[in-house]
Amino acid sequence: MTKRLGARLFLAALLFAALADFLVRPLLVVESEQGALLYAEKAYAGMPVTIRFIHSVQKTPVEEDLRVDEELSGFVLEATRYQSFGVGLPFLASEGEFRTEGDYFVMEGMERRFPQLSLRTGVGTELTLVLDGTEERLFEKLPAGSRVDLYVIAPWRWGMEKLFGTEYGAAAAAGKE
């Protein structure tokens, strides 16, 4: 009898621990403004996120390397790679360490922090995300002009937002649309 009770208590504790981990450990979420869930996986500090697109003015490829921050509350822009100078692309020494790599200009050591990211698909921009090695070709999934939001959030908070339409956590603090 005592062995059964011990086994049941152990299983209950194990189930509780698994549920607690699921509800508390943050997710990296990618959603469209239409409400489509495009990606949701457990986030971890240092999780790589790459944004690839064709610059709308220069018509050349741009790649931005980010990571999930140590607090699991947002993103850190580490580096940008591009082929030609253009509007919105970094070039000042104060923005990081600038170098050339073949046909590319590379700005590293940027360390810019963002609580969340809002991107838009565009005509010919081929917006693509690489999330922890998984490629998401958003330009093939969404109409041009669609907003795409990336954020890190605890599953219970994300569930509350979906159920009640109220924002919680970093997204609310940052004024997410």
Model-derived segments and their meaning:
Residues 27, 48, 74, 104, ...:
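A residue-level signal for beta-strand positions that form part of recognition/binding surfaces
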Residues 7-23:
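Hydrophobic membrane-insertion alpha-helices, especially the h-region
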Residues 1-5:
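Positively charged n-region of N-terminal signal peptides that target proteins for export
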